A protein has these predicted regions:
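Active-site phosphate/pyrophosphate- and oxyanion-stabilizing loops and adjacent acidic/basic residues
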Residues: 113
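Glycine-rich and polybasic anion-binding loops at the starts of cofactor/ligand-binding domains
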Residues: 105
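Short, small-residue-biased leader/transition segments that mark boundaries at the very start
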Residues: 1-3
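Activation segment
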Residues: 17-18
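A structural signal for small-residue-enriched, beta-sheet-centric alpha/beta enzyme cores
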Residues: 11, 21-24, 32-95, 99, ...
Length: 221
């Protein structure tokens, strides 16, 4: 590996390694969780974990053709996601739930430091999770934890191929890398880690919340 390599790691294995896995049998739902669960036909224990992982509830919604509704949340880490990214897939046990790592940026940094200590190689690390998109179908992998990889690349002031000066262009580099990894990291692929090589980028001290839009710039909340 060289400094232009990016190591993309599925959030699930990081969460498992850090103990972010919970038995539903140990969860006692609050009154608020019970109330929401009735509206959404959702297990109140799951709702309780979602509430614990959330800073704000943005919307609860159940489509008439869906068996179970969804809670759109602002996670404690700042991400807007369905059900606070609480997940039941690939937990390894029945009636268990996995949540996001407590500090994905720190997790990414520790992994990068470990690789450097073992291999004397400085590599970028992106911890990924699968998010839905409000105006498009399907899900894509996004960056929820970063180490050395730039969150965005500011191209404002550069020129396009026609010589026109760019005014707002700022690709979300870390998210694009994460999305590419999703072509290999799948629910049933047994491939939780991907190395992406050959991209032209320089190491930065970006954080995952550099990808979050400020509330005063948010046109929809």
């Amino acid at each position: 590996m060289c400094i232009r390599d990016s190591l993309c790691i599925a959030q699930k294995i990081v969460s498992k390694a850090e103990g972010c896995i919970y038995s539903l049998n140990d969860i006692k739902p609050s009154k608020k969780a019970l109330k929401i669960s009735d509206k959404l036909n959702k297990d109140p224990r799951k709702v309780e974990i979602i509430l614990r992982e959330s800073k704000n509830i943005i919307r609860i919604f159940k489509h008439k053709n869906q068996n179970e509704g969804v809670i759109i949340c602002e996670h404690k880490l700042g991400f807007i996601s369905a059900n606070a990214a609480v997940d039941e897939s690939n937990t390894g046990e029945i009636d268990t739930i996995i949540t996001l790592p407590k500090n994905p940026d720190l997790s990414a940094s520790k992994i990068g430091d470990y690789i450097y200590q073992k291999l004397n190689v400085s590599v970028g690390v992106v911890i990924t999770d699968t998010f839905g998109r409000p105006w498009r179908l399907g899900q894509v992998n996004v960056a929820i934890g970063l180490s050395k990889v730039p969150a965005t690349i500011d191209e404002k002031g550069k020129s396009d191929i026609s010589g026109r000066r760019l005014k707002v262009t700022e690709p979300a580099f870390a998210d694009e890398v994460a999305a590419a990894s999703g072509l290999v990291i799948k629910k049933n692929s047994n491939t939780p880690v991907v190395i992406i090589s050959g991209l032209n980028w320089k190491q930065e001290n970006s954080k995952s919340n550099d990808l979050l839009r400020k509330i005063e710039e948010d046109m929809f909340r």
